[in-house]
Amino acid sequence: LLIHGKLPNAAELTGYKTKLRRLRGLPWTVLDALETLPAASHPMDVMRTGVSVLGCTLPEKDDHNTAGARDIADRMLASLGSILAYWYRFSHSGERIDVETDDDSIGGHFLHMLHGTPPPQSWVKAMHTSLNLYAEHEFNASTFTARVIAGTGSDLYSCIAGAIGALRGPKHGGANEVAFEVQKRYETPDEAEADIRQRVANMVLDVASAPAIY
């Protein structure tokens, strides 16, 4: 829907999933670059770097045609999880994993690579719920950044790399890290609700409570 402007029918969805599975692989240039990044790298920096190297290896046509841009968007949709998981497994345990799994979905593919085994369906469902919520996010800083870069006539890889840079900031995607730290304070849902209500009443809000909308 975000890339092609409409929801697919059953046959189109099957074909699209097949296409995305074909695009999960990474060129050797990207793999080599990922292997140079230290384990202490921020995951957003890793993805930004992966997108930049991918753009150098498989550049967009100078005419920026719509069909080509959609193909690039599909490739990034399919391979960003591969970029992150390959770097993580290599940098933390020295494993050169196969990023081309047969998993039926983006969430299943990423979780399989991250943990090395097919994930439970409950994990996949949770991952997809999270991805859908992010896709529903309004006109935020990273979207704004991507549009500004696109408005200069730059290529799609630059747009996405810039958007990732904006998303990395503590007042945007970095707020999720703050939210996770908040969640770790609590042992039970009741404890969480009571504390959050108290914080709201006292006007004590974390950055994760109110990210900027552009």
What is each model feature region?
Residues 1-214:
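Hydrophobic alpha-helical bundle cores within soluble ligand-binding/oligomerization subdomains
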